[in-house]
């Protein structure tokens, strides 16, 4: 009889754990889709202010000009040949991608409301796709698998966000 009680206890513990997991999933979803607060707005504005510098404007202009002319290198080797580490262009690439890294980090840990961020900045699909090969090359070359991982996470979350937030204007 004692054995049977132990088994029953294990089963009920497993059921509770399963219920707890389901509840945690609901809580996480509720947190992710919460209505933005004034604190969320302030964090978004602070992030915008942080990247509102001359070098950030230069970095964005450089990235978009190279992208539109199809001059943005698509491999790490081509990137290094054209823009060696320490060059102004390498710094601009670093700065351009760093703002997405920081936003991804803040969203990942729940400090920045993703609805608010993606509603303001969009999907980042182009930014990630055009930067991805260089970033992956840097990860490998520097033996740093975490280099710009939050930018990558941001892009993945943005794609998922777009699926659930269709365009409201035509």
Model-derived features: positions:
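Acidic, Ser/Pro/Thr-rich low-complexity regulatory regions
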Residues: 2-170
């Amino acid at each position: 009889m004692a054995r049977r009680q132990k088994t029953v206890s294990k089963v009920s513990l497993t059921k509770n754990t399963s219920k707890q997991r389901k509840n945690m999933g609901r809580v996480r979803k509720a947190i992710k889709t919460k209505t933005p607060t004034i604190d969320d707005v302030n964090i978004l504005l602070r992030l915008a202010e942080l990247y509102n510098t001359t070098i950030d404007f230069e970095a964005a202009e450089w990235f978009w000009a190279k992208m539109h002319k199809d001059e943005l290198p698509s491999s790490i080797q081509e990137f290094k040949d054209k823009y060696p580490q320490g060059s102004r262009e390498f710094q601009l690439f670093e700065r351009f991608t760093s703002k997405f890294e920081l936003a991804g980090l803040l969203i990942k840990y729940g400090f920045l409301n993703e609805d608010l961020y993606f509603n303001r900045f969009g999907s980042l699909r182009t930014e990630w796709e055009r930067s991805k090969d260089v970033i992956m090359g840097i990860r490998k070359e520097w033996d740093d698998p975490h280099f710009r991982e939050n930018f990558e996470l941001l892009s993945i979350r943005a794609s998922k966000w777009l699926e659930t937030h269709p365009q409201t204007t035509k």
